[in-house]
Regions:
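Flexible, glycine-/basic-rich loop-and-beta segments that form/coincide
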Residues: 237-271
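S-adenosyl-L-methionine
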Residues: 108-162
Length: 271
């Protein structure tokens, strides 16, 4: 079984935003495995599948995945106040929870699966549960509580190439999209390494550029780019992209976006 340093796993799982902070948590005796065993050394090698917890941490959302949207919200200045949100790939509802806690008036929790949404959200009148729904076939009339102002996307085993086209007529004009770009599901099979992990910076760049070109070709503007503060389940670096649903075609890419700088920073944090 593949193993990795404990401090690196702490960062990958979003418990710390730097290796130095991860080391401090470990040395302070605050990091534990799922078997309630304390991790004592930053350099200790643990199976990459080990789920770690930070003692004393209070996660304010129904899942740690919510921290991905918090990063997007803060990096891209997304304002959820009184907005209608479409959460594509809602799973347990981390993104929906973040949106509602930050002022959203309602959220469509849409997922192809079933019985995943946390009960707190399932029983919330502001949440429209749309389970067993393949977004590829969604239409504007499916969203009976009103047209979404903001969409969030966190999907697996499917490319954004198949999600962005049907979203365009569903989302309000000038609506924002916070999309998680997952190289392991966007790159060709020959570009994905062992255990489904993409480590090559060039592949990361190719995936980001492809997603940007797809977006502007559909009429979205690419307005922002950063990396996710939490890696994918197998340790994959993922990226957050902000799109704007403009009326012009093709869209434009913000000249301030520096793809290489974002990739370099992500690799310095997670590898």
């Amino acid at each position: 079984m593949e193993k990795e340093r404990a401090d690196i796993l702490v960062v990958r799982q979003g418990l710390a935003d730097s290796r130095e902070k991860a080391k401090r948590f470990i040395m302070a005796g605050q990091i534990y495995t799922e078997k309630a065993l304390r991790v004592d050394k930053p350099g200790e090698k643990l199976p990459v599948t080990t789920q770690l917890t930070l003692k004393g941490e209070d996660v304010p959302y129904v899942s740690r995945g919510g921290f991905k949207l918090v990063k997007a919200m803060e990096s891209f200045d997304i304002d959820f106040t009184e907005k209608k949100v479409l959460d594509i790939g809602s799973s347990t509802g981390g993104f929906t929870d973040v949106a509602l806690q930050n002022g959203a008036s309602m959220s469509y929790a849409l997922d192809v699966g079933t019985n995943q949404l946390d009960w707190k959200l399932r029983s919330d009148d502001r949440v429209v549960v749309m389970e067993q729904t393949n977004f590829r076939y969604s239409k504007p009339e499916d969203f009976v509580a009103g047209q979404p102002d903001i969409a969030t996307i966190d999907v697996s085993f499917i490319s954004l190439d198949l999600i962005l086209p049907p979203l365009r007529p569903i989302l309000k004009s000038d609506g924002q999209v916070a999309a998680l770009v997952k190289p392991q599901f966007e790159a060709g099979k020959d570009k994905v390494g062992k255990k489904g992990i993409v480590r090559d910076k060039k592949v990361h760049r190719d995936v980001i550029e492809h997603t940007m070109q797809t977006a502007i070709g559909l009429g979205y503007d690419v307005s922002g780019l950063t990396y996710s503060p939490i890696t994918g389940g197998t340790g994959n670096i993922e990226f957050l992209m902000l799109l704007t649903n403009t009326e012009g075609e093709p869209g434009q890419i913000d000249s301030a976006i520096d793809i290489d700088a974002v990739i370099e920073e992500a690799h310095s944090v997670f590898h």
